[in-house]
Curated annotation (Swiss-Prot):
This is Elongation factor 4. It comes from Corynebacterium glutamicum (strain ATCC 13032 / DSM 20300 / JCM 1318 / BCRC 11384 / CCUG 27702 / LMG 3730 / NBRC 12168 / NCIMB 10025 / NRRL B-2784 / 534). Its EC number is 3.6.5.n1. HAMAP family: LepA (MF_00071). Required for accurate and efficient protein synthesis under certain stress conditions. May act as a fidelity factor of the translation reaction, by catalyzing a one-codon backward translocation of tRNAs on improperly translocated ribosomes. Back-translocation proceeds from a post-translocation (POST) complex to a pre-translocation (PRE) complex, thus giving elongation factor G a second chance to translocate the tRNAs correctly. Binds to ribosomes in a GTP-dependent manner. InterPro entries: EF-4, EFG_III/V, EFG_V-like, EFTu-like_2, G_TR_CS, LepA_C_sf, LepA_CTD, LepA_IV. It is found in: Cell membrane. One of its GO terms (cellular component) is plasma membrane.
């Protein structure tokens, strides 16, 4: 049973290697992980499937990893100084998308080294760069690897040079593998053993336990499963443990490793990665980034800090049928069990009824959450236009935080601050012109540009987050034929001339269509929405004006013409005064209706008007 040596825990830390894979979406990370699982024989050939670690349907369908996964693998190196020794490798699979930077930073904290995986046909992307810098800040050992070298379009020499410039190594040090065929993967694993340092503890072996939570998932049967990386000391089943940020104590019901299915074990020692179950039903009890220690004689000092994830983008989610409101609430509660960075609060809208205002880490996070609500819980939803968190100071000097247009204070405002982000865009050099033009129309300030190689350019801009969340990414892709890659990170706030544009139907504002936009874009937004609604709202028996207004000043207007019944159909010839009398009567009726009539906006009109299909 030599192959199964990884299943026994309390391994000597010198024989442990913790690593993660940093890669952009579609650069073959999950495929490489599949090959590594096969090589180490932890998955039977009959159980193997593609993207083995991506469990959620959305992950497999979109080809992205959302939750961090971890696997404990046995490996006996075939070369190098550790040849023939039994090494336990712990691979932590990280999400590659910008919205999940916080998840990545926690997974990196649990490792000593990282494999930087780059597609040999595409080169390094903006988000990979961002995660690479995160890994460098955490002092991880970086192993650069080019993947997909079996592709006809691969150009490993060119991209090896590009990576070498960024990482600061020699081009020949960049390993070349193919996740699909498995070529070069054993050599890569030997390199991991050789280059990545073993975990070290700053305390004695019998010191109080300290473990960092890097992920937690909700299991319907067993409650919350918390994934941890042991830093110091040991944890064993039936111990009392304490979460250091909340001070809550729990009994440790089960502790184990993932190889690649969860297996119970007798406990975990320093440097090991595994899971623990306490029977708690709420993920918010085990916060990612928190420190776990013994409840009695535990550690004094938590591991170095983690902040609470803060939402960047807000959007209202409303059920199309109001009867689904309780189901939506239950669904959001269940999702929050798995996703601690999702925030929500109840909201009512005159137009859309009851719903929730949700806070997300970014656009992909928002899309995925909505997808999961619709798919896993079978809900039909309308989501309002996304908005960000503004800081508003009125003339009396009172400060408000606004992330919902309907909370925008009336009257004069002395200052408005909007969040800004630092954007890094990597584009082929022929698209630099259109990309710069797009960034300027989105109020971007150029920060600099660098040529990564002759035909790839890195552009750096500072831009308002509010301009990016709407349709910036789609527009960027269409301007660059899909070749651009984008990354953004928070960069504080700036003052801005922002106004709230209301859409009025029949003189009454419809709160779902209100938006906070820059004064220069207000006219464009007003025209766009009035024209769109004129087409979408069915004609009534009376004329309906659709107006866009800032405060009491109307900036755009369209009229929905009235439907007229032919009241003269029953008059065969005859006197004109008879016809006139009927027409006057109809006119008076229309006038009366116009005064008391209300316009019902059909659900489809909301869905269509709030969709951002403009690129």
């Amino acid at each position: 049973m030599a192959e199964k040596f990884a299943e026994t825990t309390f391994t000597d830390p010198a024989r442990i290697r913790n690593f993660c894979i940093i890669a952009h979406i579609d650069h073959g990370k999950s495929t490489l992980a599949d090959r590594i699982l096969q090589l180490s024989n932890v998955v039977d050939a009959r159980d193997m499937r593609d993207q083995y670690l991506d469990n959620m349907d959305i992950e497999r369908e979109r080809g992205i990893t959302i939750k961090a996964q971890n696997v404990r693998l046995p490996w006996i190196p075939r070369s190098g100084e550790y040849e023939g020794q039994q090494i336990v490798m712990q691979m932590i699979d990280t999400p590659g998308h910008v919205d999940f930077t916080y998840e990545v930073s926690r997974a990196l904290e649990a490792c000593e080294g990282a494999i930087l995986l780059v597609d040999a046909a595409q080169g390094i992307e903006a988000q990979t760069l961002a995660n690479l810098y995160l890994a460098m800040e955490n002092d991880l050992e970086i192993i650069p690897v080019l993947n997909k070298i079996d592709l006809p379009a691969a150009d490993p020499d060119k991209y090896a040079l590009e990576i070498a410039n960024i990482v600061g190594c020699e081009p020949e040090d960049v390993l070349r593998v193919s996740g699909k065929t498995g070529m070069g993967v054993p050599e890569l694993l030997d390199k991991v053993v050789e280059l990545i340092p073993a975990p070290t503890s700053e305390f004695e072996e019998d010191a109080p336990a300290r473990a960092m939570i890097f992920d937690s998932v909700y299991d319907t049967y067993r409650g919350v499963v918390t994934y941890i990386r042991m830093m110091d000391g040991k944890l064993t089943p039936r111990q009392k443990i304490k979460m250091m940020s909340t001070g809550a104590t729990h009994e440790l019901l089960e502790i184990g490793i993932v190889s690649p299915t969860p297996k119970k074990c007798v406990g975990l020692g320093p440097g090991e990665v595994g899971y623990l179950i306490t029977g708690v039903k709420d993920v918010r009890q085990s916060k990612v980034g928190d420190t776990v220690t013994w409840a009695i004689h535990g550690a004094e000092q938590p591991l170095r800090g983690y902040q609470e994830p803060t939402p960047m983008v807000y959007s209202g989610l409303f059920p199309i049928s109001q009867a689904d409101f309780p189901d939506l609430r239950d669904a959001l509660e269940k999702l929050q069990l798995n996703d601690a960075s999702l925030t929500y609060e109840p909201e009512t809208s005159v137009a859309l009824g009851f719903g929730f205002r949700c806070g997300f880490l970014g656009l992909l996070h928002m899309e995925i959450t909505r997808d999961r609500l619709e798919r896993e819980f079978g809900l039909d939803l309308i989501s309002t236009a996304p908005s960000v968190n503004y800081r508003v100071i009125d003339e009396a000097g009172k400060e408000f935080r606004v992330h919902n247009p309907s909370d925008w204070p009336g009257g004069k405002l002395s200052e408005v601050y909007e969040p800004i982000v630092k954007v890094t865009i990597i584009v082929p050099s022929e698209f630099v012109g259109p990309t710069m033009e797009l960034c300027q129309t989105k109020r971007g300030q150029m920060g600099g540009m660098d040529y990564l190689s002759e035909d790839r350019v890195e552009l750096r801009y500072t831009m308002p987050l509010g301009e990016i969340i709407f349709d910036f990414f789609d527009m960027l892709k269409s301007r660059t034929k899909g070749y651009a890659s984008l990354n953004y990170e928070e960069a504080g706030e700036q003052t801005a001339d922002l106004v709230k544009v209301d859409i009025l139907l029949q003189g009454e504002p419809v709160d779902a269509f209100s938006a906070i936009v820059h004064r220069d874009n207000a006219q464009w937004y007003g025209n766009k929405m009035t024209v769109k609604l004129k087409e979408l709202i069915p004609r009534q028996q009376f004329e309906v004006p659709v107006q866009a207004a800032i405060g009491s000043k109307v900036i755009a207007r369209e009229n929905i013409r009235a439907l007229r019944k032919d009241v003269l159909a029953k008059c065969y010839g005859g006197d004109i005064s008879r016809k006139r009398k009927l027409l006057e009567k109809q006119k008076a009726g229309k006038k009366r209706m116009k005064n008391i009539g209300s316009v019902e906006v059909p659900q489809e009109a909301f869905v269509a008007a709030l969709s951002t299909d403009e690129a």
